[in-house]
């Protein structure tokens, strides 16, 4: 560590700093992105781009103008599941064609705890991972999202609508059924199953990839569960940082790194999901 400061503007403008990672609370992403634009440094900003769609669209336009003036991509966004070895393997298996075309998938993200989360944050902080990674996984765009609150959990803080059920449809016709749980009390639980014409592909709680094809079924790994997402996705964060550092240092664009357009779309889909909740 060369130095420390409580002033983010001082940090970003310091000549000893080559590039900046923004990992501040979600509500500070927009002001910190504005400082990043002023600094002229390359930035990796953790998702979301903003906590509201209006703010997301405004800052996205500022970033577009900034990058157009500079002549290259300067700001990426952190959606680490794109770099998770298990998600990358599922993507490879889907693209192999061996399983036929995907028809629908199930997805689960259940946290032990989600400090400071709000009902809106269930979309912009947690479900936003699903909205991004499945665009990337299927190379597709979202057509519709319908969200529901089932019976509320007694483990959730007062005023929080938790869990959340989401039914989504991609433009290709692939459908999703997913659930988001902010407080579950049993362990970090993140799983998917992609059901294809000729078989299924699953990611288990421990990140193991299991397939069912040609009358041969794999077995999901058992064992102690992670306490939180940082333990489960540690390798994903590291690979994302390596990819970003390589892009910054060499100028070679990594297509898996999320752009401002990816970040904005994730917020737009989150807003679509929030607006779809029955009144």
How would you describe each model-predicted region?
Residues 3, 18-19, 74, 104, ...:
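Short, Asp-centered acidic motifs that coordinate Mg2+ and/or phosphate
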Residues 2-62:
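Beta-loop-alpha module in the N-terminal Rossmann-like domain of NAD(P)-dependent dehydrogenases
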Residues 112-175, 180-189, 261:
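Rossmann-like dinucleotide-binding domain that binds NAD(P)(H)
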Residues 50-114:
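A contiguous active-site-proximal alpha/beta segment in oxidoreductase catalytic domains
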Residues 19-21, 64-74, 243-279:
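C-terminal helix-rich "cap/oligomerization" subdomain common to oxidoreductases
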Residues 1, 39-41, 66-73, 174:
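A short helix->loop->beta-strand "cap" motif at the edges of active sites that frequently abuts
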Residues 158-159, 171-242, 256:
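NAD(P)-dinucleotide binding in Rossmann-like oxidoreductases
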Residues 6-9, 109, 150:
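Conserved SAM/SAH-binding loop
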